[in-house]
Amino acid sequence: MSLLLGIDNGLTVTKAVIFDTAGRVVSMARRRVPQSLPRPRHVQRDMTGLWTHTAEAIADALSACPRPASDIACIAATAHGDGLYLLDGEGRPLAPGILSLDSRAGEIAARWQADGTAALALERTGQRPHASAPSALLAWLRANEPDRFARIGHVLACKDWLRFCLTGGIATDLTEASTAFTDVATQDYADDILPIFGLEALSHALPPILAPDAVAGHVTPQAAALTGLVAGTPVAAGLHDVTASSLGAGGYAEGVAAIVAGTYSINETVSRAARTGPGWFCRNGIAPGEWNAMAISPASASNYDWFLDTFCAAERAA
């Protein structure tokens, strides 16, 4: 029986879990990934450090696995959505990764709400931009760090950065592509969407869209040396963690509501038609012709972490 490696990077912890093909956990490991808050409303982390922690978790999971790494048939990653992970044209991190807890672009999102941009975005993309949406963050970067904005080569999501580290290839998947820049009807990029946000200069930087289960690349010798994986192991495109959560819980189906209590509180349901509204995001489902409607609030497990760090530090360290 072959093995599968799943990687899950949330807003606090990165995890590597090895499963058999019956879905049983064979081994697992995790690493806490530090966040930095360099100024008010900025929540970010070092992209190279994120990969290092993830590689260590993979290595630990392999060490705890009673079977060799050569038994792993495929790898896939999932991670938090929204936020921003930028590379330059040479594939180097251009700035710290911005988490979906970041709110530096709040004024931009509010302005778009007032001037009609948000309404147009809802009509075309299925969602109104919010403070940590890639569209708002890129507009913030254009206004506040124009030199860095001009050097953007690739606009990625978190799990796409981790896959790049594993394979050296640039791509995203159907679910993650719909965080800001896809047509809600066609579920693909459209020429008129980037200009809604004044971001038409970045048409070259959007990654190719793959099916979540498509092979997006293979483990490079460099990644194999860091992790203990076998070079050449296939790596699938993966998917947004919100959608992955409902799928893993058995809640990815029409007429079923899935509830996620992680760093964010999320309520989601799948439909065979694009249903849009101001109170939720309508994003791509796992397959063409499927949509995932999700209502999201950043008021869940992260609040518990803050409470424990602030009031129970001694007990937590014990």
Regions found by a protein language model. Name each.
Residues M1-P96, E123, R151, A224-A225, ...:
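N-terminal glycine/serine-rich phosphate-binding loop of ATP-dependent small-molecule kinases
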Residues I98-A118:
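Short alpha-helix plus adjacent loop in nuclease-associated cores
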Residues L86, E107-R111, S245-L247:
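Pocket-flanking alpha-helical
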Residues S63-S100, R128-P134, R163-D183, P208-D213:
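Short beta-strand-loop/turn "lid" adjacent to the catalytic site in phosphate-handling enzymes
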Residues G23, D46, I75, D102, ...:
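Residue-level signal for inorganic ion chemistry
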Residues L5-I7, Q113-G126, H130, A136-A171, ...:
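Active-site core segments that coordinate phosphate-bearing ligands/cofactors
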